[in-house]
């Protein structure tokens, strides 16, 4: 039991609004909270009878509490959100969603381009979104290309064009770069695309019908036919899209919480169109009540800077929670805009809410089933290895290269819930003889265990995907680096079976080098192969990316006079390394910054001339 003098602490505590941080014996922040009245709120933690098991566990670890006074509840809400993101305390509900949201961007250029955008919105233009994921944006871009012939190329490529590209030939771009379309006609298509993205499909069709009739009256039959085809395509799309009768913006959130797993399934509706859906799984400490889960998710999600820009008119939530009114008010004040959470809705909204709730419920049911399977596999592995303790964390290392080129080592991490991708690591291996897997493994293991401590990142088991030599090297390093630990990691080598056939793998204990096998139909065997295969996938993906980057860079930048700037111009103008290699001297001279002499040098170097 941690020692903390609550009576002395509470004696001089202010009753103002503010934020508190609770620390454990290691000096780590284990909980962050806000309060309208700090004294009243913190006193509740130290009552004689604490009903909540989670609160009992939290209080038993407190050794210190820091408080920060704020001017208002709104300031406290904002500061609490900042502290939670900064410290990621173990007893807080955590929305682990640090990726920004993708948008569809229509630039402010003379000839605007449509593009995928993620990150700060610095460039002048219009942003449509947020979309739930990158796939939804790319799908929309693909659709828009078929409906409106607007360019999607970047400005450098656009400026360098001297003839239409393939997109023009496919009818997906009107080639404003080489004046194949008038500024007025291009601007008209941009305006129609903008209306379409705002959900004003009928207005777009009406405008096109007027244009078609006008073109026909003026005997411009080819133009009239083009408008007719565009109208037909739009109507087909409209039939396929799910559209809300309400043309406003709203987020519909279905929530299901069971056995410490919470799923928030969100439907993003903007301008009456369903942009897509996305499920969120916040990290929830055991025995956390549903009110805290709901309040934490709503505040963390809607105070995300990326979401604030496109806050919907209303949020529809499948169930209410105790401080809903206070949170609504604080978020509205913080964001300086109207913010309403509705839990009682009818008609179309109720239908959307049922859909979101069904998805959330199914997601949690699936996760619980997976969790039970995963838990069973861990138990079977513990039993097979006769460990005498539970496995909390496993790591697996693999090496990938092509004939010694672009060597990459991977380290993947599994816990009892499966792959823990936030802790995955890749190591770019350098300074070794190409193809020396022993040296590569030595470098990777050294880097992983160089500063090993007891902060929860110590693996119980480390799998080495390789032969006995690599296992011996890894074991020697771990013995040295982890000598101070009470329970250093157990190392196990995973070697291919006879004929390198799957299902015939052999396992070797590090140190004793004793071999053992597991039945190929056992859960323990499947768990080891799962982490081994994931390590292999992660290593080979990193290796391929590194190899491609190296080849693209080295083959051009090894040419005298070609640096990063010219390499980028060549690749962007001609479309890739193979196109650069196949280009004539005349074609190379059309690239900005490439003189005739430089073009000849590049041509000769790549052709071996």
From Swiss-Prot:
Start and end residues of each GIY-YIG domain: 15-93
InterPro entries: GIY-YIG_endonuc, GIY-YIG_endonuc_sf, GIY-YIG_UvrC_Cho, Hlx-hairpin-Hlx_DNA-bd_motif, RuvA_2-like, UVR_dom, UVR_dom_sf, UvrABC_protein_C
Location in the cell: Cytoplasm
Keyword DNA damage belongs to the record: yes
Keyword terms of this UniProt record: Cytoplasm, DNA damage, DNA excision, DNA repair, Excision nuclease, SOS response
Coiled coil (residue ranges): none
GO cellular component term, pick one: excinuclease repair complex
Any one biological process term the GO annotation gives: SOS response
Stretches assigned to the UVR domain: 202-237
PROSITE patterns, per database record: GIY_YIG, UVR, UVRC
Keyword match Lipoprotein: no
SUPFAM superfamilies: C-terminal UvrC-binding domain of UvrB, GIY-YIG endonuclease, RuvA domain 2-like
Main subcellular location of this protein, as a coarse class: cytoplasm
NCBIfam families on file: PRK00558.1-5 (NF001824), uvrC (TIGR00194)
Function comment: The UvrABC repair system catalyzes the recognition and processing of DNA lesions. UvrC both incises the 5' and 3' sides of the lesion. The N-terminal half is responsible for the 3' incision and the C-terminal half is responsible for the 5' incision.
Similarity field: Belongs to the UvrC family.
PANTHER family referenced in this protein's UniProt entry, alphabetically: UVRABC SYSTEM PROTEIN C, UVRC/OXIDOREDUCTASE
Assembly and interaction partners: Interacts with UvrB in an incision complex.
Protein name stated in the entry: UvrABC system protein C
Source species of the chain: Shewanella denitrificans (strain OS217 / ATCC BAA-1090 / DSM 15013)
Protein encoded by which gene: uvrC
């Amino acid at each position: 039991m941690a020692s903390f003098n609550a009576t002395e602490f509470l004696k001089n505590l202010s009753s103002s609004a503010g934020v508190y941080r609770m620390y454990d014996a290691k000096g780590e922040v284990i909980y962050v909270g806000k309060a309208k009245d700090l004294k009243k709120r913190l006193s509740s933690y130290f009552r004689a009878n604490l009903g909540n098991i989670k609160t009992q566990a939290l209080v038993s670890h407190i050794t210190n509490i820091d408080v920060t006074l704020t001017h208002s509840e709104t300031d406290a809400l904002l500061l609490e959100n900042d502290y939670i993101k900064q410290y990621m305390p173990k007893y807080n509900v955590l929305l682990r969603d640090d990726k920004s949201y993708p948008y569809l961007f229509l630039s402010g250029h003379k000839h605007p381009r449509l593009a995928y955008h993620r990150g700060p919105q610095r460039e002048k233009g219009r942003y449509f979104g947020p979309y739930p994921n990158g796939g939804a944006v790319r799908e929309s871009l693909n659709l828009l290309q078929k409906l409106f012939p607007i360019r999607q190329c970047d400005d450098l490529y656009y400026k360098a064009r001297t003839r239409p590209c393939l997109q023009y030939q496919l009818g997906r771009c009107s080639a404003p770069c080489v004046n194949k379309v008038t500024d007025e006609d291009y601007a008209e298509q941009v305006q129609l695309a903008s209306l379409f993205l705002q959900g004003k499909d009928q207005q777009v069709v009406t405008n096109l019908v007027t244009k078609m009739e006008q073109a026909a009256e003026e005997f411009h039959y080819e133009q009239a036919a083009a408008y007719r085809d565009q109208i037909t395509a739009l109507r087909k799309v409209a039939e396929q899209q799910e559209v809300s009768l309400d043309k406003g913006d709203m987020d519909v959130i279905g929530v299901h919480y069971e056995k410490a797993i919470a799923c928030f399934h969100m439907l993003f509706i903007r301008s009456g169109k369903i942009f897509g859906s996305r499920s969120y799984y916040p990290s929830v400490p055991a025995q956390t009540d549903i009110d805290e889960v709901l309040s934490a998710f709503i505040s963390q999600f809607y105070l995300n800077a990326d979401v604030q820009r496109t806050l919907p008119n209303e949020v529809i939530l499948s169930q209410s929670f105790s401080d809903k009114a206070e949170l609504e008010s604080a978020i509205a004040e913080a964001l300086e805009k109207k913010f309403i959470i509705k839990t009682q809705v009818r008609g179309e909204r109720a239908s959307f809410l049922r859909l979101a709730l069904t998805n959330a419920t199914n997601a949690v049911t699936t996760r619980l089933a997976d969790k039970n399977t995963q838990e069973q596999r861990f138990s079977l592995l513990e039993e097979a290895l006769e460990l005498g303790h539970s496995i909390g964390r496993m790591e697996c290392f693999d090496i990938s290269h092509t004939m010694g080129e672009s060597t990459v080592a991977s380290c993947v991490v599994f816990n009892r819930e499966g792959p823990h991708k936030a802790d995955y690591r890749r190591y770019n291996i350098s300074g070794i003889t190409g193809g020396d897997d022993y040296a590569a493994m030595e470098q990777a293991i050294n880097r992983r265990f160089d500063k090993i401590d007891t902060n929860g990142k110590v693996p119980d088991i480390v799998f080495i995907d390789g032969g006995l030599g690599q296992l011996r090297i890894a074991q020697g390093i771990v013995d040295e680096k982890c000598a101070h630990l009470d329970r250093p990691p157990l190392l196990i080598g995973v070697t291919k079976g006879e004929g390198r056939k799957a299902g015939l793998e052999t396992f070797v204990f590090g140190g004793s080098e004793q071999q053992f096998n597991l039945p190929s139909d056992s859960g323990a065997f499947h768990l080891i192969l799962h982490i081994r295969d994931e390590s292999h996938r992660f290593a080979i993906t990193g290796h391929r990316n590194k190899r491609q980057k190296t080849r693209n860079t080295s083959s051009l930048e090894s040419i005298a006079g070609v640096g990063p700037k010219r390499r980028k111009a060549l690749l962007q103008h001609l479309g890739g390394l193979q196109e650069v290699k196949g280009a004539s001297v005349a074609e190379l001279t059309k690239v900005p910054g490439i003189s005739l002499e430089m073009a000849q040098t590049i041509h000769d170097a790549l052709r071996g001339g």
